[in-house]
A protein has these predicted regions:
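Charge-rich, solvent-exposed alpha-helical interaction surfaces
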Residues: 9-12, 29, 36, 63, ...
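Mature extracellular/secreted ectodomains of secretory-pathway proteins
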Residues: 38, 42-107
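C-terminal assembly and membrane-engagement modules of membrane-active proteins
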Residues: 173-209
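Membrane-inserting effector segments that mediate pore formation, membrane fusion
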Residues: 92-149
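Membrane-engaging insertion elements
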Residues: 5-51, 75, 128-187
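Low-complexity, intrinsically disordered, cysteine-poor segments enriched in small/polar
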Residues: 25, 29-36, 40, 77, ...
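Organelle targeting or membrane-anchoring low-complexity regions in eukaryotic organelle proteins
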Residues: 10-15, 104-112, 205-209
Length: 209
């Protein structure tokens, strides 16, 4: 990863943590109907994984009936991704970064307060209509997209997948994938390039807050 790549990723993390316009204009799993139809079409020709996808579809349906489609579950999933990211950051760096972000927030729970505030921004996005997601997941295109993006997450970012998979939250990942991309990219970078490169990224984030 080049210095320019680190700078660009640090900028996106800072913007995600500090500004509301980071999320504005972003696509999401509900509105991108073209992508849903694309995954539906791909599912028809992807005969090699038909058996495994059939099992995954059963998991989707069971998860829906257990109430997975809700804003609270989306917020929980995003919060877990923040937690993975924060586990790799030293206590001193977390204290410095989150105290700068917190503004009027005070007390010993500053980090959790900032994380929850950012998670709610994503979970409460106007276009994240859980009713539409519920019926969409029962249909073909959105269900296929959910399964394929979960599979991609498992391959590209197994640490995040493992954490979300515990409660089937990986099936919701496609809804907010773009919004949390700076965090998942940083987590993946740490796994690929090591803690030294990750710490260098965090130094850049700290200097930009």
């Amino acid at each position: 990863m080049t210095e320019a790549d680190l700078d660009e990723l640090a900028d996106r993390i800072v913007k995600m943590l500090t500004t509301t316009d980071f999320y504005e204009g972003m696509g999401n799993g509900v509105s991108e109907l073209g992508k849903n139809f694309g995954y539906l079409a791909y599912g028809f020709i992807d005969t090699d994984s038909r058996s495994s996808r059939s099992r995954e579809k059963e998991r989707v349906i069971k998860a829906i009936h257990r109430g997975i489609v809700s804003r609270d579950k989306i917020i929980e999933a995003v919060t877990r991704i923040f937690d993975i990211f924060n586990r790799n950051v030293s206590e001193a760096k977390k204290e410095t970064i989150y105290n700068k972000i917190a503004g009027g927030l005070v007390g010993s729970f500053i980090i959790s307060q900032v994380v929850m505030r950012a998670s709610k921004k994503i979970g409460n996005m106007k276009k994240m209509f859980t009713e539409i997601v519920y019926y969409g997941l029962m249909a073909g295109g959105m269900m296929d997209r959910s399964i394929y993006r979960s599979r991609s997450l498992k391959e590209q970012n197994p640490e995040v997948y493992s954490e979300l998979r515990k409660d089937d939250l990986d099936l919701l990942f496609f809804l907010f994938e773009e919004q949390v991309e700076p965090l998942t990219e940083a987590i993946k970078m740490k796994r690929t390039y090591g803690i030294g490169m990750f710490n260098k990224l965090i130094d850049k984030v700290e200097s930009r807050i």
